[in-house]
Amino acid sequence: MKMKIDILFTNTAWYEYLEWLEKDKIMYKKINELLKDIERNGTLHGKGKPEKLKYRKGYSRRIDEKNRLIYDIENDVIRVLSCKGHYEE
């Protein structure tokens, strides 16, 4: 059964998301696909090689080789922490 969840962005993640919308529509669409997949499959299953972060709270999924979608989920809310760059940078 599909979860009904809300999606919230941190300020930084929102600006990154809008930057993708403006500069690279393909990446923007990939991020949206990953968010839909999280809603369908939960935190650790589905597209983008989902994994739990080792040294901080949250999860990541690959957008591409250089960029990760970093997020956590609490009380049926996906909180997007970052959608540009890599969590190790």
Task: Please report, for each region that a protein language model flagged, where it lies by residue.
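A short, surface-exposed loop/turn module that caps and links secondary-structure elements
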Residues: 36-62
